[in-house]
UniProtKB/Swiss-Prot annotation:
It comes from the Bacteria. Homodimer. It comes from Bacillus cereus (strain G9842). GO terms for biological process: coenzyme A biosynthetic process. Its main location: cytoplasm. NCBIfam families: panK_eukar, PRK13317.1. Belongs to the type II pantothenate kinase family. Pathway: Cofactor biosynthesis; coenzyme A biosynthesis; CoA from (R)-pantothenate: step 1/5. Keywords: ATP-binding, Coenzyme A biosynthesis, Cytoplasm, Kinase, Nucleotide-binding, Transferase. This is Type II pantothenate kinase. One of its GO terms (molecular function) is pantothenate kinase activity. ATP binds at residues 8-15, 105, 127-131, 143, 230.
Amino acid sequence: MERTIGIDAGGTLTKIAYFNEKRLLTFEKFYSHEQHKIIDWIKNNNGIKQICITGGKSKLLQQLLTGSYKIIELNEFEATLAGVQYILKEEKHAIRNFILTNIGTGTSIHYVYNEQYIRAGGTGVGGGTIMGLSKLLTNIDHFEDVIPLTKVGSRKELDITVGDIYGGILSPIDNNLTASNFGKAAITESNNSSSDILATVQGLVGEVVTALSLQFAETKNIEHIIYIGSTLCNNVQLQHIISSYTEYQNKTPIFLQDGGNSGAIGALLHATK
């Protein structure tokens, strides 16, 4: 049986989407630098004839696959948006206008309206920031090891909050809001645990990404912000940081099941439509 797969070759992770024998949407995930594993997986799955590929690392991977398969290239955001629209329909979300924030190695933010889109902006702060600072500050360099520690860590000994500054005096904004990420590290002597450091790193990333998304949502008068990306996968703590901050600003956050695979899904759908 001839099969088609969609590949999103990102800066950190490469995601593959395909329909299995039961026509169920199925996913595989590899580190992008482990290209031999990606190629081996494709070669070991007999019947693959066509590959639609997108993402920043797509050219490099395409060079390794050319000649053996029919290759289709697809613009990265077109693939992502197609995947997001598919998931929205599957999850029965009736939303046409929204801010789409994709937290990958870095973060890109798009304004989507009536199935059209424009790039609103982005930031170099994203999943790559979490992993880079985790390595520098704690020498932990695997995402799977970082996430459990962020769940048990505390930001209280490292972040300065509005309440810390006002010291019990009535403040003009919520005392629990962060006034300075890692601000206490410069003014207190403390031997912080790895879990506290990682929780604070993730807090910084979550707040920066959310603040930018909120600014764009406010500018366009948009209620819904859809957050996707592999950085959110099984990352309940980061989702909580983003969700609480978004809701505090009276916007509605949406986290899609399999949102991190949107690019691969969109690539697959493009090749099989």
